[in-house]
């Protein structure tokens, strides 16, 4: 009987093939932060297409100009005109894109998701406080390292808390063909999603933000070296002012043409 049941004799073959276990890469994939974005806008701030303002986000390199830049507003950058609102048409000011930088007399502004607390911040009566260490805002000449005196106020006419403009106003016009940096800390506000990603050193899905990651890191370092508290930074951006040639060049050309016709 046992001869008829060979399996009972323990003669089955043993598989001694080596089992190979593949190692799994457990390295976490880099986090990419999703940012609200619109083509033609500065996606550092989702509240308004042109904020913060003015900004290098709307400059492109151009080696034919004095500054090496050219203003680059898209067709949808400016808001819809009140008179053309029914047609949904944006304001078009093509001549601005001929400039080689931002106006030295421009308003400097941004907005946050709630109204900032300006307690202790320089106003029109305490402008000197804006130059003190620890002040919540800084306007810095990035070429000389000099702070620019200013005061801060919100738009008193605003009726939308999330759209309230914060103005940084200067006593004198800025220097032409010069890089400036702005920093805002504290104020009981929160950074935008994009700017928080910059602070955290994270990649975003917004190309215009990614194009400025290095320059913004350098800016944060510069305002920190100037004595600004960057541990509670809520917004920072930079811009380059236009050259005098770009600002008054058209007027000089008109004058020359008029004199030639006399």
Give, region by region, the residue ranges found by the protein language model.
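Acidic, low-complexity Ser/Thr/Gly/Pro-rich repeat segments typical of extracellular/periplasmic
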Residues: 22-262
């Amino acid at each position: 009987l046992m001869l008829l049941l060979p399996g009972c004799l323990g003669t089955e073959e043993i598989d001694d093939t080596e089992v190979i276990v593949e190692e799994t890469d457990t390295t976490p994939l880099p986090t990419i932060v999703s940012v609200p974005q619109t083509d033609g806008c500065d996606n550092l701030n989702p509240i308004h297409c042109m904020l913060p303002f003015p900004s290098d986000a709307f400059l492109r390199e151009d080696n034919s100009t004095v500054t090496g830049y050219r203003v680059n507003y898209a067709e949808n950058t400016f808001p819809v005109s009140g008179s053309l609102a029914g047609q949904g048409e944006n304001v078009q000011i093509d001549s601005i894109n001929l400039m080689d930088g931002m106006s030295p007399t421009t308003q400097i502004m941004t907005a946050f998701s709630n109204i900032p607390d300006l307690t202790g911040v320089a106003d029109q009566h305490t402008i000197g406080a804006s130059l003190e260490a620890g002040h919540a805002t800084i306007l810095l000449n990035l070429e000389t390292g000099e702070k620019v005196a200013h005061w801060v106020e919100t738009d008193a006419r605003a009726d939308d808390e999330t759209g309230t403009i914060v103005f940084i106003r200067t006593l004198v016009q800025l220097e032409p063909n010069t890089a400036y940096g702005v920093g805002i800390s504290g104020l009981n506000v929160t950074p935008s999603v994009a700017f928080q990603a910059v602070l955290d050193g994270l990649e975003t899905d917004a190309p215009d933000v990614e194009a400025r990651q290095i320059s913004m890191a350098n800016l944060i370092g510069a305002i920190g070296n100037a004595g600004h508290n960057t541990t509670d930074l809520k917004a920072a951006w930079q811009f380059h002012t236009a050259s005098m040639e770009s600002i008054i060049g058209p007027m000089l050309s008109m004058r020359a043409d008029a004199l030639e016709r006399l």
